[in-house]
Design a protein with these regions (language model features):
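Alpha/beta-hydrolase fold catalytic core
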Residues: 1-31, 52-55, 89, 93-95, ...
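Active-site loop/oxyanion-hole signature of alpha/beta-hydrolase fold enzymes
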Residues: 15-17, 23-25, 59-103, 113, ...
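Conserved alpha/beta-hydrolase catalytic His-Asp/Glu region
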Residues: 138-140, 159-223
């Protein structure tokens, strides 16, 4: 599916004064898909046809990403979880299986923490994590991410362009599955929509939040009251084999697909 088709087949919902792009298609049990950084719900486009044959799939561009509104502010993971809950409530959904990746894993961890506190607006039936920074001590941020998170990030972000995104994406894709030129074009369209490329450094605050809320978010996985699985690409330089090893150390009866 082309990016233009993805957008035209979606919808917008106003949440706390922000326009949030979402898609909901298919029949069957509800599957909520949560995207990564710095992309958007289009992460799931290639598997969308297969998944919607089996599930009622719901996904969205979290504020600050993709086609949703973007602003020069730091986005709290807790706020992203609240936005997702509002979309789920709007759709009349009371329970869902969750599939998440990267940044979305952190949002899913916060949602699981809320569920354990009986404070989530819907019930998570199962949680399937893909590669992500589940533990701040194993997260190997790219050099450019570290720079953008630093005090000079606001200056460096002015130099961000499609070529910089191309270089970063080639560094994190698998050696046998490099991004195509079309992939890079789509990534840049999503990042730069609504001037989002000017605010990417602010979104990186999630790396600080992972340290601040480590105990809460790791505990959410250790005490998860639903089936929990991790599927990991071991070659991921940011959250690959080293993260999986830590996952097996910390998560009881770890269910891992490598």
């Amino acid at each position: 599916m082309q990016l233009s088709q993805w957008r035209s087949s979606g919808h917008f919902l106003t949440v706390d004064g922000q326009q949030v792009f979402y898609k909901a298609e298919g029949t069957g049990p509800v599957l909520l898909l949560i995207h990564g950084y710095p992309t958007a719900s289009f992460d799931w486009a290639r598997m969308w046809p297969a998944l919607t044959n089996l599930f009622h799939c719901v996904t969205l561009d979290m504020p600050g990403f993709g086609f949703s509104d973007k602003a020069p502010k730091k986005y709290l993971i807790k706020e992203q979880a609240a936005t997702i809950s509002e979309v789920i409530r709007h759709l009349g959904i009371t329970s869902a299986h969750v599939l998440s990746r990267d940044y979305g894993d952190t949002v899913a961890q916060e949602m699981m923490a809320q569920q354990l506190e009986n404070n989530l607006a819907f019930r998570i039936e199962s949680l399937h994590l893909l590669n992500g920074g589940l533990f701040p001590e194993t997260h190997r941020a790219l050099f450019i991410q570290k720079l953008l998170l630093s005090p000079i990030g606001g200056l460096l972000i002015r130099l961000l362009n499609k070529n910089a995104i191309r270089k970063s994406m080639h560094n994190i894709f698998g050696p046998n599955t490099p991004p195509s030129n079309q992939d890079i074009d789509d990534f840049w369209t999503l990042i730069s929509a609504n001037n989002g490329h000017k605010y990417m450094h602010l979104l990186l605050d999630y790396m600080k939040q992972r340290k601040q809320y480590r105990e809460r978010w790791v505990s959410a996985l250790q005490n998860a009251n639903v089936p929990l699985r991790l599927t990991a690409g071991m070659a991921d330089p940011i959250s690959g084999a080293h993260m999986v090893a830590r996952y097996k150390q910390l998560i009881p009866n770890a269910d891992v697909i490598e």
